[in-house]
Amino acid sequence: MIDKNQTCGVGQDSVPYMICLIHILEEWFGVEQLEDYLNFANYLLWVFTPLILLILPYFTIFLLYLTIIFLHIYKRKNVLKEAYSHNLWDGARKTVATLWDGHAAVWHGYEVHGMEKIPEDGPALIIFYHGAIPIDFYYFMAKIFIHKGRTCRVVADHFVFKIPGFSLLLDVFCALHGPREKCVEILRSGHLLAISPGGVREALISDETYNIVWGHRRGFAQVAIDAKVPIIPMFTQNIREGFRSLGGTRLFRWLYEKFRYPFAPMYGGFPVKLRTYLGDPIPYDPQITAEELAEKTKNAVQALIDKHQRIPGNIMSALLERFH
């Protein structure tokens, strides 16, 4: 530490530059011992960083509840129109899609590559890799609604329907939990439907190596065969760097298998670059079996991962991609 009376002028090589800068700032702002304040601020940052990383993922839940509040307000304001209109929720969907699309652009510089592979009309089954938090799919649904004017139905886990307050959100955005016959009916009606075969298990267990956790699930393939629709593979680059899960530990895996509820804590919320890639559609083939189609689809999703994702994923690299 140098004396404040010591000159910080030109030629004083013995005086460290940063110390001189601190003393100048102390004089400008009239604050004594600025260096101590800065050291204390640095200490607070070190202490609270882990807490911030654990809290940030729940900001997404906060945004979902804001969306739900908006939908309730919208419903009350349009209660009389409901009896006369079959498109009561179109205005709400457009508003919510615009807000989520804006969040995607600002926080993640979100992009979709291969949007032309989504049909303008007619059915298709979208199969996607499930991140720790599927925020990429929320963004993707917003893009589909804005650019295609279509609502993409999605199969959600049973526990999602038990979350307090979520029923209206799930209803407005056409989420369902099955069964297989319902999925086939939706596709035969000409709608888009999305399924993540890995589901919550993949969200919890997969990690920065982006291993696909589908087990022996092939029900989605049977749905595509029964409905005679193409399958479109989908993967979002850096989704595991945006949010990370501790669900791969033995305790949290046991808890999930026992109670079928994701108890594992998450951390992240980093503003990494997110790019969703849509692969070439896998056309309907009446000669293929569900097992063969499931394996073919898994290979297609894996090909997207191999082509577009750095393995293992790196949070800092994903952040720097925002500037590329």
Swiss-Prot record:
Its main location: endoplasmic reticulum. Catalytic subunit of the alternative triglyceride biosynthesis pathway, which mediates formation of triacylglycerol from diacylglycerol and membrane phospholipids. Synthesizes triacylglycerol at the expense of membrane phospholipids, such as phosphatidylcholine (PC) and its ether-linked form (ePC), thereby altering the composition of membranes. The alternative triglyceride biosynthesis pathway is probably required to provide the energy required for rapid growth when fuel sources are limiting. It maintains mitochondrial function during periods of extracellular lipid starvation. Belongs to the diacylglycerol acyltransferase family. Highly divergent. SUPFAM superfamilies: Glycerol-3-phosphate (1)-acyltransferase. It comes from Homo sapiens (Human). Residues 72-125 are cytoplasmic. The chain crosses the membrane at residues 51-71, 126-146. Glycans are attached at N5. It catalyses: a 1,2-diacylglycerol + a 1,2-diacyl-sn-glycero-3-phosphocholine = a triacylglycerol + a 1-acyl-sn-glycero-3-phosphocholine; a 1-O-alkyl-2-acyl-sn-glycero-3-phosphocholine + a 1,2-diacylglycerol = a 1-O-alkyl-sn-glycero-3-phosphocholine + a triacylglycerol; a 2-acylglycerol + an acyl-CoA = a 1,2-diacylglycerol + CoA; an acyl-CoA + a 1,2-diacyl-sn-glycerol = a triacyl-sn-glycerol + CoA. Residues 1-50, 147-324 are lumenal. Its EC number is 2.3.1.-, 2.3.1.20, 2.3.1.22. It is found in: Endoplasmic reticulum membrane. This is DGAT1/2-independent enzyme synthesizing storage lipids. It comes from the Eukaryota. Keywords: Acyltransferase, Endoplasmic reticulum, Glycoprotein, Lipid metabolism, Membrane, Transferase, Transmembrane, Transmembrane helix.
